[in-house]
Amino acid sequence: MSGFEQLFAGKLPKLVMFDLDGTLVDSVPDLAVAVDTMLAELGRPIAGLESVRAWVGNGAPVLVRRALANHLDHSGVDDELAEQGLEIFMRAYAQKHEFTVVYPGVRETLKWLQKMGVEMALITNKPERFVAPLLDEMKLGRFFRWIIGGDTMPQKKPDPAALFFVMKMAGVPASQALFVGDSRSDVQAAKAAGVACVALSYGYNHGRPIAEENPAMVIDDLRKLIPGCLDMDAEILLPDINSPSSRESIVVVTRKLWMKVIKALARWRWRA
């Protein structure tokens, strides 16, 4: 039985919200290049791929602080140094994403959901300025009606504000929505919003098994959500959906727009 069939009693959710890094794309190689560039400019030893893989998931400022601390615990990092490091990192990461790849099964799953008329949103802690260019490079942007970056709203995951916002915009209750992610922040945000969460075992969770966070389901391939597609050896052929003739059908939520609706979301503000 597929993931959707198990979670929604044989039906499909009306809305699926996705994380980006570690869920749809493996961006660690490019993030590691930017982190090491930052560390080298500051005269510090480079971190390397595997260290960066353990540090990602909570946004660029936290990643930079962890790199400067060379540890998950970054409480001792000087704020001025962190700001300097963040500026260098952002400049380095903005240059290119040549090593980022889309995970197997992602495009097939997104195409299938689009074909079935399921609304989709992207909610990531990645800084807003990097999200749309990366989605364009990976040819994933056309699948999402709503796109929210880590600095789009005053709160980021694990705060559920972005999930509440998207559900309100879509007119979909939590019982008919799903969040798909790979980290503790994703699971916590989904639980706080009352939304079922499917977690990917291949993503970034600071080196800890994502099953420890008790999501509704853990899978190792997005195609396991699709009815009839549990055989990973079977090729999945889906007709391409024509790209929207106008970008007006895609809503990229920006900080300016968010400030107009923040009062409407205030009653949903999560209290930790």
From Swiss-Prot:
UniProt cross-references to PANTHER family, sorted A to Z: PHOSPHOGLYCOLATE PHOSPHATASE (PTHR43434:SF1)
Family under the similarity heading: Belongs to the HAD-like hydrolase superfamily. CbbY/CbbZ/Gph/YieH family.
Native source organism of the sequence: Pseudomonas savastanoi pv. phaseolicola (strain 1448A / Race 6) (Pseudomonas syringae pv. phaseolicola (strain 1448A / Race 6))
Cofactor(s) listed: Mg(2+)
Known pathway: Organic acid metabolism; glycolate biosynthesis; glycolate from 2-phosphoglycolate: step 1/1
GO biological process: carbohydrate metabolic process; DNA repair; glycolate biosynthetic process
Catalysis: reaction(s): 2-phosphoglycolate + H2O = glycolate + phosphate
Residues the record lists as binding Mg(2+): D19, D21, D182
GO CC field: cytosol
Record carries keyword S-adenosyl-L-methionine: no
CDD domains hit by this protein: HAD_PGPase
Name the UniProt record assigns to this protein: Phosphoglycolate phosphatase
EC numbers for this chain: 3.1.3.18
Catalytic residues, chain numbering: D19
